[in-house]
Amino acid sequence: MQTSLLKPKIIAVESLGENHARVVMEPFERGYGHTLGNALRRVLLSSMVGYAPTEVTIAGVVHEYSTLDGVQEDVVNLLLNLKGVVFKLHNRDEVTVTLRKEGEGVVTAGDIELAHDCEVINPNHVIAHLSKGGKLDVQIKIEKGRGYVPGNVRRYGEDTAKIIGRIVLDASFSPVRRVSYAVESARVEQRTDLDKLVMNIETSGVITPEEAIRQSARILVDQLSVFAALEGTETAAEAPSRAPQIDPILLRPVDDLELTVRSANCLKAENIYYIGDLIQRTENELLKTPNLGRKSLNEIKEVLASRGLTLGMKLENWPPAGLDK
């Protein structure tokens, strides 16, 4: 009886348009089409690295609910249009570019003044419409990232000091626009219970659909490699046992509790030198201590309570090795 699993031998890529392709893989063992298809789809949508505008500063604008004279779009729509520009950076993680346009006409992504290592994938994308006398002066910060990052997360980050007029954008870095998959029946010789995986992938143009699926597969392999390495690690039974960590406050001398001299001397007479020694004693045990009355006991309880401790607590492995008496 054959025990080895089938691996796909037929991989076909069919172009469905610009940046849109259908990838067909077969044969898979029954169930593996859904297992791998769903995993690849989730990685493609959430874990691919891309580029997006993250901050915008518009001359004459203080906040996103403003309007600009001579610009048909309000600032909210202007920002939405800017988020639709697809950027690609080469050998750097962030860059700031400028968009300046005056006079009547249409403003497109092709009007953005780019650095030599920055590229616009969709230069015909419309950003705004200017009327006679209209003017637009915009600074756009582009960053490399992964997935989707809401603007409020970045706005309150440690390196995002408030700058008047700067607008922080929600950033969708993923270069993958849409992914769907279907599992169909496949046949190999006499076997008809196999799966065929069909994936439809559409990207923004930063990467091709074929490269997107290659990258997602590499991400999955890298994540699963941790499980493959389990055979070379110590088992729980073989791992050396470690003593539980002891709260440092328990290792401090009772003198640190700043008790009255009478109470402190009574404790030391009973060989109670550390706070860890003290909390393991009960009230009845302490009341049997010579010269330690109810008043001293209440003092001890109050001081311990102020540190989140009580009498009668149980400690394992006490006293720890090397603790001087």
UniProtKB/Swiss-Prot annotation:
Region (Alpha C-terminal domain (alpha-CTD)): 246-325
Gene Ontology CC terms: cytoplasm; DNA-directed RNA polymerase complex
Listed Gene3D superfamilies: 5' to 3' exonuclease, C-terminal subdomain, DNA-directed RNA polymerase, insert domain, RNA polymerase, RBP11-like subunit
Phosphoprotein listed as a keyword: no
Region (Alpha N-terminal domain (alpha-NTD)): 1-231
Function: DNA-dependent RNA polymerase catalyzes the transcription of DNA into RNA using the four ribonucleoside triphosphates as substrates.
Entry protein name: DNA-directed RNA polymerase subunit alpha
Organism name: Burkholderia cenocepacia (strain HI2424)
